[in-house]
Amino acid sequence: MSLSWWRAGAAKKRMDDDESLLVKQQQQQCVALIVGVTGLVGNSLAEMLPLPDTPGGPWKVYGVARRARPSWNEDQPMTYISCDVSNTGEVEAKLSPLSDVTHIFYATWTSRSTEEENCEANGKMLKNVLDAMIPNCPNLKHICLQTGRFHYVASVVDWKINGSHDTPLTEDLPRLKTNNFYYTQEDILLEEVKRKEGLTWSVHRPGTIFGFSPYSMMNLVGTLCVYAAICKQEGAVLRFPGCKGAWDGHSDCADADLIAEQQIWAALDPHAKNQAFNVSNGDLFKWKHLWKVLADQFGVECGDYEEGQQLRLQDVMKDKGPVWDKIVAENGLSNTKLEDVGKWWFSDTILWNECRLDSMNKSKEHGFLGFRNSKNCFLYWIHKVKAYNLVPSTYT
C-alpha cells in the first residue's frame, strides 16, 4: 500500500514541535477499535493501522462488524469481533472488556425506511458503543465519527424535495431544519465525550467514496464493475445510467485510504481535535471521462450520454441474477449473489444527481495536506475488486 501521509507537509512540523506529545505516543501503544471494519473506510483503516510506518503505529487493532469475518480480510492483523452494535446487551458483553482501547474509529450505519427511524436506529448504535467503551477504557483519548456529505442536505431519502445548502459546502454551514441521522450522531458524540476529561473527538464528512468492500451498502466502484462485467457477458454497450449533470458536470470523490489517513491524523494531531472536516480527493472529474476508463478495464464498448433516457440500474439489473451466476461459475469467481455485490440504489443515487462539491480548505488549514488523483484512484479500486476475484480479472 502506498501511503501519502500528512507528514509530508505542515502537520509534521506541528507534531514535531510538540515533543511531549510524540514522546507520550511512543511510550504507550495506540489501540484502535474500528466499528464497521468491513465497510469501505473500515477496511482501509484495518489495512493501514498495523503498518509500522503509520503514525502512532504499528497499532493494535480490534475490528467490529455484524457478520462473521469474511475471507477477504482474513490476512489483516487484527482481533475480529462479530457484534451487532444495535443490540445493547451484546455490545456491553463483547466490547466493554476491551479496556486497552485508546482510539475509536466509528464508521458504520444502518438504513431504515424513514429518516426518523434512521435517527433512532443509528443514534442507538453509536450510543451503545460509547456507553460500553468510555467508562471502561481508562486510556481512551479520541473518537473519530464518520458521517458524510448528506450532513449538508435535508434527507438521505428525499434530499431533492427538502433542499440543501449552496455549494461549495463548508463545515461551518448551519444545520438544515430537518431530520438527519448525522445530526443525531453528532449530538450524541458531543454529549458522551463530556463523561471523560480530556477525551477529544473529530467528525469526518466524505462525499462519494471510492474504496473496496463487498459488504458496503455504498460500494460504488464495485457496483459499476459488476455492471460492466454483465455488459461484457451479454455483448452490450456500457450505457451511462445517469443524468446529464453527472455525465458532463464536475464531480468529486473521496478515496477510502485518504479518509482513513485523515482520521488517523485527526486522532493524533492536537490541532485537529474537536473539529468537523470535509474530506475529498482535492481534484475534480467528469463521469464521461471515468466511463471510458471503466469500459477499457472490462473490454466493452463505451456508451455516450443518451438524451432523454431514463436508464436506472435498479430496473435494468433486477432480472440479471442468472447472468451473474453464470459469470461467477465460468470465471471461477468468489461465490457471490448479484444482490450482494450490486448496490444499484446507490449508483442510481449518485449518477442521477449532480455532485454537491465541498471545500477542503479547513482540513488543509489545520494541517492535513493529503490528496489523490481521482482517475488513478478509480483504477486502483477497480484493480482491487479484480484482485479479490469478485469480477473477472482479464478482458480483451
Swiss-Prot record:
<dbReference type="GO" id="GO:0016627">
    <property type="term" value="F:oxidoreductase activity, acting on the CH-CH group of donors"/>
</dbReference>
<dbReference type="InterPro" id="IPR055222">
    <property type="entry name" value="PRISE-like_Rossmann-fold"/>
</dbReference>
<keyword id="KW-0560">Oxidoreductase</keyword>
<protein>
    <recommendedName>
        <fullName>(S)-8-oxocitronellyl enol synthase ISY2</fullName>
        <ecNumber>1.3.1.122</ecNumber>
    </recommendedName>
</protein>
<keyword id="KW-0521">NADP</keyword>
<feature type="binding site">
    <location>
        <begin position="108"/>
        <end position="109"/>
    </location>
    <ligand>
        <name>NADP(+)</name>
    </ligand>
</feature>
<comment type="similarity">
    <text>Belongs to the short-chain dehydrogenases/reductases (SDR) family.</text>
</comment>
<feature type="binding site">
    <location>
        <begin position="84"/>
        <end position="85"/>
    </location>
    <ligand>
        <name>NADP(+)</name>
    </ligand>
</feature>
<dbReference type="Pfam" id="PF22917">
    <property type="entry name" value="PRISE"/>
</dbReference>
<feature type="binding site">
    <location>
        <position position="182"/>
    </location>
    <ligand>
        <name>NADP(+)</name>
    </ligand>
</feature>
<feature type="binding site">
    <location>
        <begin position="66"/>
        <end position="67"/>
    </location>
    <ligand>
        <name>NADP(+)</name>
    </ligand>
</feature>
<comment type="function">
    <text>Iridoid synthase that catalyzes the first step in generation of the iridoid ring scaffold using the linear monoterpene (6E)-8-oxogeranial as substrate. Iridoids comprise a large family of distinctive bicyclic monoterpenes that possess a wide range of pharmacological activities, including anticancer, anti-inflammatory, antifungal and antibacterial activities. Catalyzes the conversion of the linear monoterpene (6E)-8-oxogeranial to (S)-8-oxocitronellyl enol, a precursor of nepetalactones, which are metabolites that are both insect-repellent and have euphoric effect in cats.</text>
</comment>
<keyword id="KW-0520">NAD</keyword>
<feature type="active site">
    <location>
        <position position="182"/>
    </location>
</feature>
<feature type="binding site">
    <location>
        <position position="146"/>
    </location>
    <ligand>
        <name>NADP(+)</name>
    </ligand>
</feature>
<feature type="binding site">
    <location>
        <begin position="216"/>
        <end position="218"/>
    </location>
    <ligand>
        <name>NADP(+)</name>
    </ligand>
</feature>
<feature type="binding site">
    <location>
        <begin position="38"/>
        <end position="40"/>
    </location>
    <ligand>
        <name>NADP(+)</name>
    </ligand>
</feature>
<dbReference type="InterPro" id="IPR036291">
    <property type="entry name" value="NAD(P)-bd_dom_sf"/>
</dbReference>
<feature type="binding site">
    <location>
        <position position="209"/>
    </location>
    <ligand>
        <name>NADP(+)</name>
    </ligand>
</feature>
